[in-house]
Amino acid sequence: MLSYQDKVGAFYKDNARANSSKLSLVTEEQGGRRPPYLLFVLLILLVGIMALLAITGVRFHQVSTSNMEFSRLLKEDMEKSEAVHHQVIDVLTPLFKIIGDEVGLRLPQKLNEIKQFILQKTNFFNPNREFDFRDLHWCINPPSKIKVNFTNYCDTIGIRKSIASAANPILLSAHTGGRGDIFPPYRCSGATTSVGRVFPLSVSLSMSLISRTSEIINMLTAISDGVYGKTYLLVPDYIEGEFDTQKIRVFEIGFIKRWLNDMPLLQTTNYMVLPENSKAKVCTIAVGELTLASLCVDESTILLYHDSNGSQDGILVVTLGIFGATPMDQVEEVIPVAHPSVEKIHITNHRGFIKDSIATWMVPALVSEKQEEQKSCLESACQRKSYPMCNQTSWEPFGGGQLPSYGRLTLPLDPSIDLQLNISFTYGPVILNGNGMDYYESPLLGSGWLTIPPKNGTVLGLINKAGRGDQFTVIPHVLTFAPRESSGNCYLPIQTSQIMDKDVLTESNLVVLPTQNFRYVIATYDISRGDHAIVYYVYDPIRTISYTHPFRLTTKGRPDFLRIECFVWDDDLWCHQFYRFETDSTNSTTSVENLVRIRFSCSRSKP
C-alpha cells in the first residue's frame, strides 16, 4: 500500500495544481510566440470580411437589376391590360350594340320591306301603268332574295356549293310532305271525297306578263325538289329596240316557297330572254339541282349527218342558274353527237330532268337499224286481229313507212368539260303520237318514267320505264299490251277505233307524281257540263282505282293547248296548269295560268 506521502505525491503528479509553477513558466514562454499567429488570423478574417462584402455587393446589384426588370414587365402588363380595357370599351361594346340593333331593329325593318314588296306588287299589276320589261327586276329580285357576291370566285364548283348552301334553307321547307301519299289510306271504308281550289300565281314572271295584253304561247313547266322552271314564247304588245322579231323566247327559274297558310308560292329568282330568230322557236325544258337546261331549234325535225358531206345544224343550248350573274347562265350552240344509225330526231314539247349534273330528254328518233324487227312485231300482231294501227301507212312524226324509235338526249353540265349533246336510241312499244315525250325522275335508281301523251281521243298514251345509265332500255309499264299473235319483245299502245268522248276537246300531257308509290295524272278540257271545265284524273294502278275532280271555268271557248305539271305539297296534290283557248264571244285568244289544289279525304275509316 502507498504511504500518505506517496499518495500526496501521486495527487500532485497527476493534478495540474501540483505543477502550477511550471505551467506558469511554460505559459509565459508561449505568450512570447502569439503575435505572428494573431496577425495571420486577423489577415484571414479581414480577407473573409472583404469577400463577404464583395459577395453582398454583387447580390445587391443582382437584386436591384431584378427589381428593375420586374418593374418594367409589370409596367408592360399594366399597359396591355389598359389596352384590353380600351378594346372592350371602344370595340366590343359598340359591336354588342350593333348586334342588338340588328336583332331588335332590322327584323321589324325586314318585315316592313316585305310589306312594301307586297304593295309594290299590287301597284305593278295596276292596268293603268304602262308595262316596261326592265321593271321586272324588282319583281324577280325582291328584298328577301339571298345575295351572293361572286366577284372573288373563279371556280364554278365553288360557286355551285355556295348557291346550294344559300338555297338549302328554302328547299328544306319545300321538301316537307313532298313524297307523301295523296290518296286516303287503305283502311278507308266510306266514300272518298275531293275538294279543289284554284289559286293565282302572285310573283311569277309569266303571270305578270299574262296580266298584260301580251300573249303567251306553248308554256312548258318543270318542277323538281322545290325548284320550278318555265319556258314559253311571248308575243308582247310592243317590241323593244333590241328585238327585231314579233316573238320573244323567255326562260325563268325560281323557288317554290311557303307562303300564307303554308301554300306554295312560285317565286322567280332568275330569267333570260332571247329573240325567236335565235333558234329558239321550239324548246325543251329540264330542271334539277338548282339549274334549268333547255334545247332549242328552229325546226322540230333535225337531220343528222355522220360525214363531212352535209352541213350539220346546231342545237341551241340554254342553261340558267337559280341566281343570276353566274357561270351557269349560258347560251351556246352545239353540234350533236349521235349513233351512226340515228338519221333524224324530232324535238317538240319535251320535259326532262337533271340528275347527277346530266340533263336528259326523250324524243322520237328515226333509226335505220333493226327496222325489220319493229315491222315484224306489227305485222304479226295484225295477222288475226285488226287493230286500228294496222291500217296505218304513215307514222308520226317522220312520215313514211318507217316506225320511230326512242331517242335519248343527254347534256352533261359538268363545269370541267365543254357542253356536248349526246344522242342514243333503243326500241320499245310502238309510238303512235309523235309530239310530246316527257321524262320524269323515278325513286328507282338508274331509271325514270317516260310518258307519251294521248292523242285525238283514240290513243290513250303510254308510260314506260326508261334507263338513265349506259344501258339505255325502254320497258313498257302501263297503257300498253302484248298481242297474243306476236312473240318476243312486242308491245302496242292502247288505241280505240273511234273517239271515246266527243265532249273532251283536248287532253293534257301525262304527269307521273314524285311519290314513292306509282301515281299519274292527266287533265282534259271538258264541255259536257253546262259550264266548261278542266277535269283532272288521278290514277293509282297498284290499287286499280282512280279519282276525278272538275274545275269549272267562268268562260267558254275552243282550247288549242293544255299543259300541266303536278307535285305533292303537304300530302295534297297541286298542279300548275296553262291553257289557251279561243273565246266563243269575241273570237280572241286567251291564255290562263294558275295553280290548282286537290285534297282527297275519307268519310269513314276502319278502326
UniProtKB/Swiss-Prot annotation:
Residues 59-607 are virion surface. The chain crosses the membrane at residues 38-58. InterPro entries: Hemagglutn/HN (IPR000665), Sialidase_sf (IPR036278). One of its GO terms (cellular component) is viral envelope. Residues 1-37 are intravirion. Glycans are attached at residues 149, 309, 391, 422, 456, 587. This is Hemagglutinin glycoprotein.
